């Protein structure tokens, strides 16, 4: 299915950085997995299926992942003009949304924006200024998820003398050059 193919594409392209603490290993994916899944599920659930020849797109760049869904908000509003904490749930395709809910891909109504933003803010590698961006017009709906690991391509190994463990220290590419 398009959903499973899309989730596979996201998973294959979602690299992980990690750091080791004295007790555990902390994985830090480029994109919070639940946030990316939520974007794809919502793009499929709320797209305008009457736009023949158009489809949901997932485009991955070095610094971001962009989701495009045909058709703007069903209400005609522009998401960038709204308070994301108070956007009412209006489903363009209630049957599709119901099926996705029964398959445990969708949660309660109207929780998508909040879930995506919370997943970013709770990520171990969260940085201010990398908040997800939502944009819509009458033609489509776009979500931009920023790569939380962009610029952290170099890992230097340092040895901690006091306990003999090795810990990965993440260094931005800009710091090395």
Which sequence ranges carry the predicted segments?
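C-terminal regulatory or interaction extensions
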Residues: 1-177
């Amino acid at each position: 299915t398009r959903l499973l193919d899309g989730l596979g594409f996201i998973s294959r392209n979602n690299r992980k950085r990690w750091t080791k603490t004295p007790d555990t290993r902390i994985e830090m994916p480029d994109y919070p997995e639940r946030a990316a899944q939520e974007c794809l599920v919502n793009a499929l659930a709320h797209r305008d299926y009457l736009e023949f020849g158009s489809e949901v797109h997932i485009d991955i760049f070095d610094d971001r992942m962009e989701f495009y869904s045909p058709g703007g908000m069903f209400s005609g509003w522009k998401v960038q003009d709204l308070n994301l904490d108070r956007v009412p749930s209006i489903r363009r395709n209630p049957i599709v949304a119901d099926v996705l809910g029964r398959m445990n891909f969708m949660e309660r109504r109207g929780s998508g924006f909040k879930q995506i933003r919370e997943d970013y803010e709770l990520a171990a590698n969260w940085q201010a200024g990398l908040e997800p961006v939502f944009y819509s017009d009458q033609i489509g709906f776009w979500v931009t998820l920023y790569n939380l690991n962009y610029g952290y391509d170099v890992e230097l190994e340092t040895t901690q003398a006091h306990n003999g463990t090795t810990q990965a220290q993440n260094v931005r590419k800009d710091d090395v050059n």
